Protein backbone atom coordinates (compact mmCIF):
# COMPACT_ATOMS: atom_id res chain seq x y z
CA UNK A 1 0.00 0.00 0.00
CA UNK A 2 0.94 3.63 -0.44
CA UNK A 3 -0.06 6.67 1.62
CA UNK A 4 -0.42 10.42 1.15
CA UNK A 5 -1.25 13.02 3.83
CA UNK A 6 -3.19 16.17 3.03
CA UNK A 7 -5.25 18.95 4.59
CA UNK A 8 -7.44 19.12 1.48
CA UNK A 9 -11.06 18.10 1.73
CA UNK A 10 -11.46 15.96 -1.40
CA UNK A 11 -14.40 14.04 -2.85
CA UNK A 12 -12.12 11.51 -4.57
CA UNK A 13 -8.57 10.24 -4.35
CA UNK A 14 -5.96 12.89 -5.21
CA UNK A 15 -4.52 12.60 -8.70
CA UNK A 16 -0.74 12.83 -9.22
CA UNK A 17 -0.18 13.14 -5.45
CA UNK A 18 3.18 12.32 -3.86
CA UNK A 19 2.33 8.91 -2.40
CA UNK A 20 4.98 7.12 -0.35
CA UNK A 21 5.18 3.44 0.72
CA UNK A 22 2.94 2.73 3.73
CA UNK A 23 5.11 0.88 6.23
CA UNK A 24 3.72 -0.88 9.31
CA UNK A 25 3.77 1.53 12.24
CA UNK A 26 3.93 4.65 10.06
CA UNK A 27 2.60 7.69 11.95
CA UNK A 28 0.25 10.16 10.31
CA UNK A 29 -2.31 12.71 11.40
CA UNK A 30 -2.88 16.02 13.08
CA UNK A 31 -6.10 17.96 13.60
CA UNK A 32 -8.23 18.25 10.42
CA UNK A 33 -5.74 16.06 8.52
CA UNK A 34 -6.54 13.30 6.05
CA UNK A 35 -4.43 10.41 4.87
CA UNK A 36 -5.18 8.62 1.62
CA UNK A 37 -4.11 5.02 1.18
CA UNK A 38 -4.15 3.14 -2.09
CA UNK A 39 -3.44 -0.43 -3.14
CA UNK A 40 -4.28 -2.93 -5.89
CA UNK A 41 -5.59 -6.50 -5.81
CA UNK A 42 -6.11 -9.21 -8.41
CA UNK A 43 -8.39 -12.10 -7.46
CA UNK A 44 -6.52 -15.45 -7.53
CA UNK A 45 -8.08 -18.72 -8.67
CA UNK A 46 -8.52 -19.96 -5.09
CA UNK A 47 -10.69 -16.95 -4.19
CA UNK A 48 -12.82 -16.88 -7.34
CA UNK A 49 -16.62 -16.75 -6.99
CA UNK A 50 -16.68 -16.40 -3.19
CA UNK A 51 -17.33 -13.34 -0.98
CA UNK A 52 -14.22 -11.22 -0.44
CA UNK A 53 -13.69 -8.56 2.21
CA UNK A 54 -11.18 -5.79 2.86
CA UNK A 55 -9.79 -5.44 6.38
CA UNK A 56 -8.12 -2.08 6.91
CA UNK A 57 -6.12 -1.16 10.00
CA UNK A 58 -4.94 2.29 8.99
CA UNK A 59 -5.87 4.45 11.99
CA UNK A 60 -8.09 7.48 11.78
CA UNK A 61 -11.38 8.26 13.49
CA UNK A 62 -13.39 7.28 10.41
CA UNK A 63 -12.36 6.14 6.95
CA UNK A 64 -14.15 5.72 3.63
CA UNK A 65 -13.38 2.94 1.18
CA UNK A 66 -13.45 3.55 -2.56
CA UNK A 67 -13.50 0.53 -4.87
CA UNK A 68 -12.51 1.49 -8.41
CA UNK A 69 -13.40 5.09 -7.57
CA UNK A 70 -16.85 4.38 -6.10
CA UNK A 71 -17.56 4.98 -2.36
CA UNK A 72 -18.05 1.47 -0.99
CA UNK A 73 -17.96 1.38 2.80
CA UNK A 74 -16.79 2.72 6.13
CA UNK A 75 -14.07 1.84 8.63
CA UNK A 76 -14.14 3.02 12.25
CA UNK A 77 -11.77 2.54 15.16
CA UNK A 78 -12.59 0.16 18.07
CA UNK A 79 -13.07 3.07 20.49
CA UNK A 80 -16.17 4.08 18.54
CA UNK A 81 -17.70 0.62 18.70
CA UNK A 82 -20.27 1.31 21.40
CA UNK A 83 -21.70 4.48 19.88
CA UNK A 84 -21.01 4.22 16.16
CA UNK A 85 -20.35 0.56 15.39
CA UNK A 86 -16.97 -1.07 14.96
CA UNK A 87 -16.65 -1.37 11.18
CA UNK A 88 -13.34 -3.12 10.58
CA UNK A 89 -14.10 -5.25 7.51
CA UNK A 90 -15.92 -4.17 4.33
CA UNK A 91 -17.40 -6.28 1.56
CA UNK A 92 -15.56 -6.11 -1.76
CA UNK A 93 -17.69 -8.52 -3.76
CA UNK A 94 -20.06 -11.43 -3.21
CA UNK A 95 -18.10 -13.32 -5.82
CA UNK A 96 -16.24 -12.61 -9.03
CA UNK A 97 -14.07 -14.34 -11.61
CA UNK A 98 -10.40 -15.06 -11.14
CA UNK A 99 -8.03 -12.33 -12.40
CA UNK A 100 -10.59 -9.59 -11.69
CA UNK A 101 -8.56 -6.51 -10.77
CA UNK A 102 -9.50 -3.97 -8.09
CA UNK A 103 -8.11 -0.57 -7.17
CA UNK A 104 -8.71 0.47 -3.55
CA UNK A 105 -8.51 3.99 -2.11
CA UNK A 106 -9.08 4.72 1.58
CA UNK A 107 -9.66 8.22 2.88
CA UNK A 108 -8.83 8.22 6.60
CA UNK A 109 -9.72 11.25 8.72
CA UNK A 110 -7.64 12.08 11.81
CA UNK A 111 -10.52 14.06 13.38
CA UNK A 112 -10.79 17.45 15.03
CA UNK A 113 -11.27 18.87 18.50
CA UNK A 114 -14.81 18.99 19.87
CA UNK A 115 -15.16 20.81 23.20
CA UNK A 116 -18.19 18.74 24.21
CA UNK A 117 -21.95 19.04 24.10
CA UNK A 118 -22.59 19.07 27.86
CA UNK A 119 -22.26 22.28 29.92
CA UNK A 120 -20.07 20.80 32.68
CA UNK A 121 -17.82 18.64 30.47
CA UNK A 122 -14.66 19.75 28.68
CA UNK A 123 -12.98 17.20 26.47
CA UNK A 124 -9.17 16.94 26.58
CA UNK A 125 -7.19 17.94 23.49
CA UNK A 126 -5.73 14.82 21.81
CA UNK A 127 -2.81 14.86 19.36
CA UNK A 128 -4.89 13.28 16.54
CA UNK A 129 -1.96 11.05 15.57
CA UNK A 130 -2.59 7.59 14.13
CA UNK A 131 -0.65 4.53 13.00
CA UNK A 132 -0.88 2.50 9.82
CA UNK A 133 -0.66 -1.26 10.28
CA UNK A 134 -2.10 -3.15 7.33
CA UNK A 135 -4.64 -3.49 4.53
CA UNK A 136 -5.64 -7.09 3.83
CA UNK A 137 -8.09 -8.96 1.62
CA UNK A 138 -9.80 -11.75 3.56
CA UNK A 139 -12.53 -14.36 3.28
CA UNK A 140 -15.26 -15.28 5.75
CA UNK A 141 -15.38 -18.84 7.06
CA UNK A 142 -19.11 -19.65 6.69
CA UNK A 143 -18.94 -22.60 9.10
CA UNK A 144 -17.52 -20.56 11.97
CA UNK A 145 -19.66 -17.52 11.11
CA UNK A 146 -22.93 -19.48 11.31
CA UNK A 147 -21.87 -21.31 14.46
CA UNK A 148 -20.76 -18.14 16.24
CA UNK A 149 -24.01 -16.24 15.73
CA UNK A 150 -26.24 -19.23 16.48
CA UNK A 151 -24.30 -19.97 19.64
CA UNK A 152 -24.42 -16.33 20.74
CA UNK A 153 -28.15 -16.06 20.03
CA UNK A 154 -29.15 -19.16 21.97
CA UNK A 155 -26.82 -18.27 24.83
CA UNK A 156 -28.49 -14.86 25.09
CA UNK A 157 -31.91 -16.50 25.02
CA UNK A 158 -31.09 -18.45 28.19
CA UNK A 159 -30.60 -15.11 29.95
CA UNK A 160 -34.01 -13.69 29.06
CA UNK A 161 -36.39 -16.66 28.86
CA UNK A 162 -38.43 -17.58 31.92
CA UNK A 163 -36.47 -19.79 34.31
CA UNK A 164 -39.25 -22.40 34.13
CA UNK A 165 -39.44 -22.37 30.32
CA UNK A 166 -39.20 -25.79 28.68
CA UNK A 167 -37.57 -24.14 25.65
CA UNK A 168 -34.90 -22.59 27.88
CA UNK A 169 -34.25 -25.99 29.43
CA UNK A 170 -33.83 -27.55 25.97
CA UNK A 171 -31.45 -24.77 24.92
CA UNK A 172 -29.30 -25.33 28.01
CA UNK A 173 -29.20 -29.09 27.33
CA UNK A 174 -28.14 -28.38 23.76
CA UNK A 175 -25.44 -25.94 24.83
CA UNK A 176 -24.07 -28.60 27.16
CA UNK A 177 -23.85 -31.02 24.23
CA UNK A 178 -22.12 -28.35 22.18
CA UNK A 179 -19.65 -27.86 25.03
CA UNK A 180 -18.81 -31.56 24.91
CA UNK A 181 -18.25 -31.56 21.13
CA UNK A 182 -16.19 -28.46 20.30
CA UNK A 183 -12.53 -27.73 20.93
CA UNK A 184 -12.11 -24.53 22.89
CA UNK A 185 -8.98 -23.48 21.00
CA UNK A 186 -7.77 -24.07 17.42
CA UNK A 187 -4.39 -24.84 19.00
CA UNK A 188 -5.82 -27.96 20.65
CA UNK A 189 -5.99 -29.89 17.38
CA UNK A 190 -5.50 -29.62 13.61
CA UNK A 191 -7.68 -27.34 11.46
CA UNK A 192 -9.71 -30.13 9.85
CA UNK A 193 -10.60 -31.73 13.18
CA UNK A 194 -11.44 -28.35 14.72
CA UNK A 195 -13.84 -27.45 11.89
CA UNK A 196 -15.36 -30.94 11.84
CA UNK A 197 -16.25 -30.52 15.52
CA UNK A 198 -17.82 -27.13 14.79
CA UNK A 199 -19.95 -28.67 12.03
CA UNK A 200 -21.09 -31.46 14.37
CA UNK A 201 -21.99 -28.95 17.09
CA UNK A 202 -23.88 -26.86 14.52
CA UNK A 203 -26.20 -29.80 13.89
CA UNK A 204 -27.21 -29.67 17.56
CA UNK A 205 -27.88 -25.93 17.42
CA UNK A 206 -29.89 -26.24 14.21
CA UNK A 207 -32.30 -28.64 15.93
CA UNK A 208 -33.40 -25.80 18.20
CA UNK A 209 -34.99 -23.96 15.29
CA UNK A 210 -37.82 -26.51 15.23
CA UNK A 211 -39.34 -24.87 18.33
CA UNK A 212 -41.70 -22.09 17.22
CA UNK A 213 -43.65 -19.42 19.05
CA UNK A 214 -47.42 -19.72 19.28
CA UNK A 215 -49.63 -17.93 16.75
CA UNK A 216 -50.32 -15.27 19.40
CA UNK A 217 -46.67 -14.21 19.65
CA UNK A 218 -45.85 -10.81 18.11
CA UNK A 219 -43.51 -10.48 15.16
CA UNK A 220 -40.54 -8.10 15.35
CA UNK A 221 -39.32 -6.61 12.09
CA UNK A 222 -36.24 -4.42 11.79
CA UNK A 223 -35.29 -1.70 9.33
CA UNK A 224 -32.01 0.18 9.14
CA UNK A 225 -31.68 3.91 9.81
CA UNK A 226 -28.85 6.26 10.69
CA UNK A 227 -29.20 9.46 12.69
CA UNK A 228 -27.19 11.95 10.63
CA UNK A 229 -26.42 15.20 12.45
CA UNK A 230 -25.89 18.19 10.15
CA UNK A 231 -23.06 20.44 11.39
CA UNK A 232 -23.21 19.27 15.02
CA UNK A 233 -19.68 18.49 16.24
CA UNK A 234 -18.31 19.11 12.77
CA UNK A 235 -18.71 21.51 9.82
CA UNK A 236 -20.93 20.80 6.83
CA UNK A 237 -18.10 19.23 4.82
CA UNK A 238 -17.79 16.51 7.46
CA UNK A 239 -21.55 15.93 7.35
CA UNK A 240 -21.17 15.25 3.64
CA UNK A 241 -18.43 12.72 4.28
CA UNK A 242 -20.32 11.06 7.14
CA UNK A 243 -23.31 10.62 4.86
CA UNK A 244 -21.15 9.17 2.10
CA UNK A 245 -19.51 6.70 4.49
CA UNK A 246 -22.84 5.66 5.96
CA UNK A 247 -24.86 5.37 2.75
CA UNK A 248 -22.14 3.51 0.87
CA UNK A 249 -21.92 1.08 3.76
CA UNK A 250 -25.68 0.49 3.62
CA UNK A 251 -25.52 -0.34 -0.09
CA UNK A 252 -22.80 -2.91 0.60
CA UNK A 253 -24.90 -4.42 3.40
CA UNK A 254 -27.81 -4.71 0.97
CA UNK A 255 -25.51 -6.47 -1.47
CA UNK A 256 -24.48 -8.94 1.22
CA UNK A 257 -27.97 -9.27 2.73
CA UNK A 258 -30.59 -8.76 -0.04
CA UNK A 259 -33.46 -8.80 2.48
CA UNK A 260 -32.03 -5.77 4.34
CA UNK A 261 -33.86 -2.44 4.06
CA UNK A 262 -32.63 1.04 4.99
CA UNK A 263 -34.61 4.27 5.43
CA UNK A 264 -32.87 7.47 4.32
CA UNK A 265 -35.15 10.20 5.67
CA UNK A 266 -33.35 13.42 4.66
CA UNK A 267 -33.65 14.75 1.12
CA UNK A 268 -30.93 17.32 1.91
CA UNK A 269 -28.44 14.56 2.67
CA UNK A 270 -29.39 12.80 -0.57
CA UNK A 271 -28.76 16.07 -2.41
CA UNK A 272 -25.28 16.21 -0.85
CA UNK A 273 -24.52 12.83 -2.40
CA UNK A 274 -25.88 13.91 -5.78
CA UNK A 275 -23.50 16.88 -5.83
CA UNK A 276 -20.36 15.42 -4.23
CA UNK A 277 -20.56 11.66 -4.84
CA UNK A 278 -22.62 11.09 -8.02
CA UNK A 279 -21.57 7.44 -8.37
CA UNK A 280 -22.85 6.76 -4.85
CA UNK A 281 -26.05 8.69 -5.56
CA UNK A 282 -26.60 6.50 -8.61
CA UNK A 283 -26.34 3.42 -6.39
CA UNK A 284 -28.79 4.91 -3.90
CA UNK A 285 -31.38 5.51 -6.63
CA UNK A 286 -30.91 1.99 -7.95
CA UNK A 287 -31.59 0.55 -4.48
CA UNK A 288 -34.98 2.28 -4.13
Walk through the language-model features, giving the residues of each.
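Carbohydrate-active enzymes and regulators
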Residues: 1-288
Amino acid sequence: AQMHETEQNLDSAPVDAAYIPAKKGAVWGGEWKYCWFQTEYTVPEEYANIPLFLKADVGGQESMLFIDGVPSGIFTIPQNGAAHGYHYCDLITMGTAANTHYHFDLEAYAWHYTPGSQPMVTNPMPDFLHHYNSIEVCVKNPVINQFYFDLKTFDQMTEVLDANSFVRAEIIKTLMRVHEIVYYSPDDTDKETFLAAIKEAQKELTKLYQYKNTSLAPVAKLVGHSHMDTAWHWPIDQTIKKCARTFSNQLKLMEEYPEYRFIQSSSYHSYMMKVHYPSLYKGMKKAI
